[in-house]
């Protein structure tokens, strides 16, 4: 990778490169990229980076997105809603969550229930 500016298509398991490419608008020299297509659900102002220890979106950073993308937004709002435009577009295959409450399979609340059926025998929601 060239300093985080390239996307490795071999690990693009969510199809992020095409989503990001659509969101990039031509920019003038010195301007930050515009992510109009990928705007977060809320237009609420973000706290300053220093006040919350903000280093960018952890989801995009973990997926080795470009620095300009992962520093342009936060993963979640203070109330827990997902702000990351990339993650908001993902639908969990286990529970169908997306948008404000989107998550990957790794963080799906159903994952623990599905892995340990013995502890779920008293859970009426999981009975057939």
From Swiss-Prot:
Protein residues bound to Zn(2+) 2: 92, 95, 103, 108
Motif (C2HC 2): 92-108
Localization per Swiss-Prot or TrEMBL: Cytoplasm; Cytoplasm, Perinuclear region
GO cellular component assignments: cytoplasm; germ plasm; perinuclear region of cytoplasm
Location of region: Essential for its translational repressor activity: 7-23
One Gene Ontology MF term: zinc ion binding
Entry binding sites for Zn(2+) 1: 57, 60, 73, 84
Expressing tissues: Ovary and testis.
Residue ranges, annotated region (Disordered): 25-52
Zinc finger (Nanos-type): 56-110
GO biological process: negative regulation of translation; oogenesis
Keyword field contains Coiled coil: no
Domain notes: The Nanos-type zinc finger is composed of two C2HC motifs, each motif binding one molecule of zinc. It is essential for the translation repression activity of the protein.
Protein's job: Acts as a translational repressor. Can mediate repression affecting different steps in the translation process: cap-driven, IRES-driven, polyadenylated RNAs or nonpolyadenylated RNAs. Essential for the development of primordial germ cells (PGCs) by ensuring their proper migration and survival.
Oligomeric and partner information: Interacts with ccnb1.
Protein name stated in the entry: Nanos homolog 1
Species per Swiss-Prot/TrEMBL record: Xenopus laevis (African clawed frog)
Top-level taxonomy: Eukaryota, Metazoa, Chordata, Craniata, Vertebrata
């Amino acid at each position: 990778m060239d300093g985080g500016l390239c996307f490795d298509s071999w690990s693009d398991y969510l199809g992020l490169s095409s989503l990001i490419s659509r969101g990039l608008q031509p920019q003038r020299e010195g301007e930050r990229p515009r992510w109009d297509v990928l705007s977060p659900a809320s237009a609420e102002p973000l706290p300053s980076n220093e006040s919350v220890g903000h280093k960018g979106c952890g989801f995009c950073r973990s997926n080795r997105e470009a620095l300009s993308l992962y520093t342009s937004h936060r993963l979640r709002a203070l109330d827990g809603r997902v702000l990351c435009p990339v993650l908001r577009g993902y639908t969990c295959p286990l529970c169908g969550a997306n948008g404000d409450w989107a998550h990957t399979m790794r963080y799906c609340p159903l994952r623990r229930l599905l892995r340990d059926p013995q502890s779920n025998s008293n859970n009426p929601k999981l009975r057939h």
